[in-house]
Regions:
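Charge-dense, low-complexity intrinsically disordered segments
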Residues: 53, 87, 121, 146, ...
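Extracytoplasmic thiol/disulfide redox context detector
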Residues: 2, 9, 13-89, 151-170, ...
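Structural alpha/beta surface segment adjacent to cysteine/selenocysteine redox centers
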Residues: 54, 60-136
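Short N-terminal micro-motifs specific to bacterial/archaeal maturation
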Residues: 39, 102, 118, 146-147, ...
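C-terminal cap of thioredoxin/glutaredoxin-like
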Residues: 132-205
Length: 205
């Protein structure tokens, strides 16, 4: 009887230990994800990281503010796709933006801003037409099948998964990231009116 109880105790202990190790590994993995995403690109000490949805009204209002802040402070902006499931054309718009990224990142970002500028008129039926107008204006071909191999969708999905991994709850989500203060590598900007003040504070650290 004692042997049986001992074996039961050992089994439970082993199970708890295994679960603890799995939990620790998951936490470490999540922290690694945060550390890899919320950091400036090589060569920069401070940057703005944005997770956005091209159909999101607040994202439309935030994008030009972020762009102006980038120019004012001469710091880069890193844009991530986070299309929300409740929006009926934002995912395809993100895939289209990724296509223009293949020509140049600047062109892809210009397309994102173009979609924001026309967001109120864009819908699932005319999104392609807006893409064609943009492509023609920039003398770029827009294939009939934009993502034949699925590579562009995979990039959008990877960005969305990154957002989920760092527990994103809304769009836009804007971070000021920095290498200047290891104890506080990123700060979320929760109000657009605080964007410049947050950058100032991070740059002073």
């Amino acid at each position: 009887m004692l042997v049986k109880k001992h074996n039961t105790f050992c089994n439970r202990f082993a199970l708890l230990l295994a679960l603890s190790l799995i939990t620790l590994a998951a936490c470490a993995s999540a922290q690694d994800t945060v550390d890899s995403v919320l950091r400036p690109p090589k060569g920069s000490q401070v940057a703005i990281v944005v997770f956005e949805d091209l159909q999101c009204p607040m994202c439309r209002r935030t994008a030009p503010l972020v762009e102006q802040a980038s120019k004012t402070y001469k710091i880069p902006v890193i844009r991530h796709d986070f299309p929300l499931p409740g929006h009926n054309w934002s995912y395809q718009a993100a895939v289209m933006a990724r296509y223009f990224d293949t020509h140049s990142k600047a062109l892809g970002n210009e397309f994102r801003d173009y979609i924001f500028e026309n967001q109120l008129e864009v819908n699932p039926a005319n999104l392609r037409s807006y893409g064609e107008k943009f492509a023609a204006a920039h003398k770029v071909d827009l294939p009939f099948v934009i993502d034949a191999g699925g590579k562009l969708s995979a990039l959008v999905n990877a960005d969305r998964d990154l957002g989920k991994a760092i527990k994103l709850e809304h769009t836009p989500t804007v971070y000021i990231v920095s290498t200047r203060n290891p104890s506080k590598p990123f700060v979320e900007v929760k109000d657009n009116s605080q964007l410049y003040l947050t950058i100032d504070a991070v740059m002073k650290d």
